[in-house]
Design a protein with these regions (language model features):
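Active-site entrance/lid segments in N-terminal catalytic domains of soluble metabolic enzymes
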Residues: 11-182
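Intrinsic disorder/low-complexity signal
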Residues: 6-7, 111, 293
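Short pre-catalytic strand/loop immediately N-terminal to key active-site residues, enriched for Gly-Thr
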Residues: 30, 189-190
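Conserved active-site-proximal phosphate/metal-binding subdomains
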Residues: 166-188, 194-336
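Acidic, glycine-rich active-site loops and adjacent beta-strand->loop/helix elements
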Residues: 87, 159-160, 192-193, 215-216
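Short, Lys/Arg-enriched N-terminal segments with co-localized hydrophobic residues
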Residues: 1-10
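Low-complexity, intrinsically disordered/propeptide-like segments
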Residues: 4-5, 103, 125, 206
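Exposed boundary/loop context
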Residues: 1, 17, 25-26, 151, ...
């Protein structure tokens, strides 16, 4: 998986990898499909800026809602994008066969799966439709399973990441090269990535791209309230997150708000999930994201350790261009 750099030492320089070639994107940078946050407009902005935007399907009300989002994306960009399918118990009521049917009808070419891999009927339908399937994994074992069932790429999701990080606490600096050692398909590094220096490190470890969640949350195009984004940019650092729900084998990295601290104390005391369910529910987070902006006292935010590297809210284009420039400069330090 040789990474090639073309052009002069300036912004016209382009890093081409197996990911950019296979997906037809300019930059090997993915935007995480953050539930309750990412919408069609944000996906299109990422695509137009040169990366791969990913739409979370699980937070669409139904298949027709998903169709309307896909139509918006196609109105706003002619560049590649992906749709995320998250297979986990909390989303058991999502009618993914209908969602996949809509994706096929609307010409979606790339699917990201997370949680569990797609079951055989869905996977077979995806491959029959000619879709590229990417699976997000937190262990080498799961990555090998994804490869064995026909996934075309995997996201190696280190425990620095926001949201669901698995139960093994493997950081991206170990998980990425381990996946590179064991797999023959392209690897995308996720978890703790926020700048071009880290992107260069990921490429040096053998990855073919990087995956941004927290960095993309703090962008101008992200639809959550400016009050939320500004608060995080001003107050977050590398110590500002905490695991929650480990007792329920659903470990999730969150911004350490007052709500999370209270829920964590209950969890440590041996509470039932029902005792904290309302506090961590997506509908509660939506109220904070779009109505009151109260980060500390209303709902929870999936937030990664990369928050310590993010100090301002900038445009998606600025994120992409600055990361690429810094990555190329960093790699250039090692030119023979």
């Amino acid at each position: 998986m040789l990474n090639k750099i073309r052009g002069g030492m300036n912004m016209s320089k382009v890093i081409k990898t197996a990911v950019t070639e296979k997906l037809g994107i300019k930059y090997p940078i993915f935007q995480g499909g953050m539930a309750w946050i990412v919408n069609a407009e944000m996906v299109a902005a990422v695509a137009n800026a040169g990366g791969l935007g990913i739409l979370p399907s699980g937070t669409c009300a139904d298949a027709e809602h998903l169709r309307s989002e896909l139509k918006k994306i196609k109105e706003l960009t002619d560049k590649p994008y992906a749709v995320n399918f998250t297979f986990m118990p909390s989303l058991a009521n999502v009618d993914y066969p209908s969602y996949l049917k809509v994706c096929i009808e609307e010409g979606v070419k790339i699917i990201e799966t997370s949680g569990m891999p797609a079951k055989p009927p869905l996977m077979e339908a995806m491959k029959k439709a000619g879709m590229i399937v990417i699976h997000k994994c937190t262990t080498v074992k799961h990555a090998l399973k994804a490869q064995s069932i026909g996934c075309d790429m995997v996201v190696a999701d280190g425990c620095e990441c926001a949201g669901h990080s698995g139960e093994t606490d493997i950081g991206s600096i170990v998980l990425t090269p381990r996946c590179v050692e064991e797999l023959s398909i392209p690897i995308i590094t996720a978890g703790g990535i926020a700048n071009g220096k880290q992107m260069a490190a990921a490429l040096m470890m053998g990855a073919d791209g990087v995956y941004l969640g927290t960095r993309m949350l703090l962008t101008k195009e992200c639809p959550v309230l400016d009050k939320v984004k500004d608060y995080l940019a001003e107050n977050a650092d590398e110590t500002c997150t905490s695991y929650l729900l480990r007792a329920f084998r659903n470990t999730t990295r969150l911004y350490k708000s007052n709500v999370v601290k209270e829920a964590l104390e209950k969890e440590k005391a041996g509470c039932e999930f029902a005792d904290i369910a309302e506090a961590v529910a997506g509908v509660t987070a939506k109220k904070m994201f779009y109505e009151n902006g109260d980060v500390e006292n209303c709902g929870v935010i999936s937030y990664g350790q990369a928050g310590g590297l993010i100090h301002s809210v900038i445009s998606i284009q600025e994120v992409m261009d600055s990361m690429m420039a810094e990555c190329i400069e960093s790699l250039g330090r090692f030119d023979a």
